[in-house]
Amino acid sequence: RVYYTLYRKGEVWSVDPYNPEDNRKEVGLPRMGTGVLMVWHPTGNFCYLIMYERHTIRRSDYNPETGQMSMPYFICGKDNVRNWNDGVGPNVRLSKPWQGFFLKNPSYKGSDDEYDFYFSDNGNHCVRTLSPLGKVHTYAGRADGGTSGYREGELRTQAQFNYPEGIVYDAKRKAIYVGDATNRVVRKTTQEEEP
């Protein structure tokens, strides 16, 4: 199935690409008229709903027996409060979280969930990670007190972004590519550079 959101109605829908008549509402969202980006976990067991206009990330679990998604529940950030703070759950502050991807973390081998979620935090000019336990950590950017800019260097103490949006992982090259929107460049970091 292909999943999509309806902005004005605040709903998640899905359609069977081989049978467009099979188009159905999956679940309602906590807010109508707010932008939402969906990123599915590699297992297909759940997806993150990035509510970038509300500065939060929510989660909806998928039940393979019923084929239904659960009502989205809160993971991190505070509704309609934009700021910056690493931490867990409601103590985290985000500012327009944007795109993201899941990346297997070797240190989680044998755990129920072996993936960290990397995402661009547009208004905070940085890239952050969300662990399976809900801990958010700034991965890159925010050098010089979180100011925007364009600078290469060590990920946390030197690198600067200017409203990053797109982010993707290239498994072949073991590299993360970040669409640094206002700088109008695509930036690259490798896992060897991680702090």
Regions found by a protein language model. Give the residues of each.
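Gly/Pro-rich loop segments of beta-rich domains
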Residues: Y18-V36, G67-Q99, G134-E165, P195
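Hydrophobic/aromatic beta-strand positions that recur at structurally equivalent sites within the blades
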Residues: T5, W13-Y18, R59-Y62, T129-L130, ...
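A short loop-to-beta-strand structural motif that recurs across blades of beta-propeller domains
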Residues: G10-W13, H55-R58, H125-T129, K135, ...
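Residue position within the beta-strands of beta-propeller blades
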Residues: Y4-T5, Y48-I50, F119-S120, V178-D180
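Blade-level signature of beta-propeller repeat domains, shared across WD40, Kelch, NHL, RCC1
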Residues: Y163-P195
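Residue-level detector of Asp-centered blade-edge/turn motifs that repeat once per structural unit
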Residues: W40-G44, F102-E114, Y169-R173
